[in-house]
């Protein structure tokens, strides 16, 4: 027998105290015996209930007269059933399933209450029947599962491109600053886009360039000087158009297909003060007008696959395509014909390029691709790897390996009639060479310090060097660095560049560094006189010390047609500069560079002149850029 003590609240609001004894007979029936306690006993039982952790029993007693010595107590089973149901519904096992509980129906023993001889201390005995009552499993939701017929027909909503049509935006094909289908703002059909871009570039250039007096004739008879009139001026008008037809979402993943065509139209006019400066024919005199249509891009790009849920990918591009081997265009930046496999890994942190290219012949006077000529007999195989946030956050690192194989042994004249291959210097003989370029490039910042760095080594072999008929080993190197720091609207930078030169043009080593097709964005770029203008090597052959848009002293006829020359004097450049954003629309750039030869031996041999100073001079430049629509 288990004695359970509890304090109960009577239906009339009075407090009474009792003890409940529970017994079970042999038939399994349970009987309950309730004994009324005296006030003192009730107080004791009340305190014991705090420490004994009782099991709650929901039993309500009805008391007719609290002060009477005898009371009729009735167990109200109906009222207590509600309380039992509440307690039962909240009991749960550890796994969340309901457990079965005992549902008790109480039957009053009227005979016990009807006996007037019984006192308050006598017991009142009631017999209750206990039976197991299963509890239904709870459903997950009281809401019934919808049936197929409960669904309405779907409402079609325009995609994120065409939904603007319902908002009243008009498509203006002539307005590039508003919604425009031919600008790629929304699909042309399905998920195919069409994008048209046009860029107009107008150049008026007044310059002074060292110009030799004509060999056969001159514009001013009677001159005996080597150098003629330096004054020149040129006007160039270029219109570049680009047509892109592509399929894809264009925002979070690369297009599935891309077809790109970039024709460029050029008209140029040049006037000089010396004969034979523009054309090998003296009858052409001192002016030249030329036009050309070049194809700078014509390729198809196929998205092969996605390799991660972040849309890292592999793509294949075939055709005439722009390519740059590094961040600043030191080694190879051109639009050759080729096949390129490229893609990304690790959420775009790693990028790679694998490619094979053949350069196109260039138009001599515009520098654009000439698709009417055969491809050059020069194979370029490229493999490079870009790694973001390496070695630190905010800095890009790149490793490059390029193999160059040149087999151009035929004589080639440019459109103005001057010989371009082989170069008119030294023995003027056909050459072949195989060179491997290995390099590291970095671009980014370390804290507030911005940094661009590039380093290359060129290793290989050339058959018949420029000044010697013997084969020669190519061993040359290159290094450039440009740190800068920002002070609000002002950026201050320093530049240093070194390209190795050849110490002895007649030994079996070619140590002058030369690029494949350079276009350096460095030390002022095309705002620098030395980089922008082609400086001729007067009296040393029909070559230039450095080509237009080039910084290396390669001693080629020009970089568009000429072969690489690894027997050159090299270059040393040290400079400082500043870029000032005076207004959002107005930028002022200042540059001051010092230039020198790394070695003077190749220049001395070419000119048959000794004791040539290694200092080239100072290059001072300023550029004012106004962008009226920049905000």
Model segments located where?
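Extracellular/periplasm-exposed beta-strand and loop segments of Gram-negative cell-envelope proteins
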Residues: 211-213, 225-232, 272-276, 284-290, ...
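N-terminal periplasmic/intermembrane-space "pro-region" immediately following the signal or transit peptide
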Residues: 65-255, 488, 492, 504, ...
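N-terminal secretory signal peptides that target proteins for export/translocation
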Residues: 1-46
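Bacterial N-terminal signal peptides
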Residues: 49-62
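Signature for the C-terminal beta-barrel architecture of outer-membrane proteins
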Residues: 310-312, 321-510, 572-576, 582-584, ...
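C-terminal structural cap/anchor segments
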Residues: 503-607, 615
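Outer-membrane beta-barrel channel domains
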Residues: 142-149, 178-187, 212-214, 218-364, ...
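Short loop/turn motifs that connect adjacent beta-strands in outer-membrane beta-barrel proteins
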Residues: 168-196, 207-211, 246-259, 304-314, ...
């Amino acid at each position: 027998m288990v004695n359970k003590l509890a304090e109960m609240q009577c239906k009339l609001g009075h407090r009474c105290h009792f003890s409940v004894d529970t017994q079970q007979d042999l038939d399994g029936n349970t009987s309950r015996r309730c004994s009324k306690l005296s006030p003192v006993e009730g107080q004791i039982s009340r305190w014991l209930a705090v420490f004994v952790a009782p099991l709650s029993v929901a039993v309500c007693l009805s008391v007719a007269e609290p002060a009477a010595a005898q009371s009729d107590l009735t167990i109200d089973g109906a009222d207590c059933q509600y309380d039992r149901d509440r307690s039962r519904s909240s009991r749960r096992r550890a796994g969340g399933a309901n457990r079965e509980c005992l549902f008790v129906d109480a039957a009053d023993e009227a005979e016990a209450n009807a006996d007037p001889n019984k006192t308050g201390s006598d017991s009142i005995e009631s017999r209750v029947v206990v039976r197991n009552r299963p509890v239904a499993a709870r459903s997950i939701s009281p809401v019934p599962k919808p049936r197929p017929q409960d669904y309405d027909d779907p409402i079609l909503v325009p995609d994120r491109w065409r939904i603007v049509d319902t908002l009243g935006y008009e498509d203006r094909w002539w307005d590039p600053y508003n919604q425009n289908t031919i600008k790629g703002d929304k699909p042309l059909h399905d998920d195919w886009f069409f994008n048209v871009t046009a860029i107009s570039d107008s150049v008026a250039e007044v310059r002074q360039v060292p110009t030799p007096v004509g060999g056969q004739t001159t514009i001013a008879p009677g001159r005996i000087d080597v150098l003629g009139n330096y004054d020149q001026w040129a006007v160039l008008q270029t219109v570049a158009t680009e047509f892109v037809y592509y399929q894809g979402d264009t925002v979070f993943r690369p297009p599935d297909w891309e077809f790109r065509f970039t024709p460029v139209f050029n008209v140029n006019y040049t006037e000089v003060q010396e004969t034979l400066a523009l054309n090998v024919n003296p009858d052409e005199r001192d002016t030249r007008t030329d036009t050309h249509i070049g194809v700078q891009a014509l390729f198809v790009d196929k998205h092969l696959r996605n390799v991660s849920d972040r849309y890292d990918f592999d793509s294949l591009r075939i055709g005439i395509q722009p390519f740059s081997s590094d961040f600043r265009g030191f080694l190879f930046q051109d639009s050759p014909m080729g096949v390129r496999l490229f893609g990304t890994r690790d959420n775009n942190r790693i990028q790679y390029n694998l490619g094979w290219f053949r350069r196109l012949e260039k138009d001599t006077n515009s520098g654009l691709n000439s698709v009417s000529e055969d491809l050059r007999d020069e194979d370029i195989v490229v493999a490079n790897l870009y790694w973001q946030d390496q070695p630190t956050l905010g800095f890009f690192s790149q490793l490059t390996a390029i193999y160059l194989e040149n087999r151009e042994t035929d004589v080639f004249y440019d459109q103005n009639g001057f010989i371009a291959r082989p170069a008119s210097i030294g023995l003027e003989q056909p050459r072949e060479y195989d060179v491997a370029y290995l390099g590291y490039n970095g671009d980014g910042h370390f804290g507030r310090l911005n940094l661009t760095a590039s380093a290359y080594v060129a290793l290989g072999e050339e058959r018949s060097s420029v000044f010697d008929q013997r084969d020669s080993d190519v061993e040359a190197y290159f290094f450039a660095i440009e740190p800068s720091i920002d002070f609000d609207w002002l950026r201050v930078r320093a530049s240093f560049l070194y390209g190795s030169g050849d110490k002895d043009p007649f030994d079996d080593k070619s140590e002058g560094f030369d690029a494949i097709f350079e276009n350096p964005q460095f030390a002022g770029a095309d705002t620098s006189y030395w980089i922008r203008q082609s400086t001729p090597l007067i009296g040393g052959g029909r070559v230039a010390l450095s080509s237009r848009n080039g910084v290396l002293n390669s001693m080629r006829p020009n970089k568009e047609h000429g072969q690489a020359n690894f027997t050159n004097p090299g270059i040393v450049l040290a400079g400082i500069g500043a870029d000032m954003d005076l207004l959002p629309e107005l930028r002022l750039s200042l540059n001051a560079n010092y230039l020198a030869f790394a070695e003077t031996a190749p220049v001395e041999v070419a000119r048959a002149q000794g004791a040539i100073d290694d200092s080239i001079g100072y290059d001072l430049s300023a550029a004012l850029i106004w962008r009226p629509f920049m905000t």
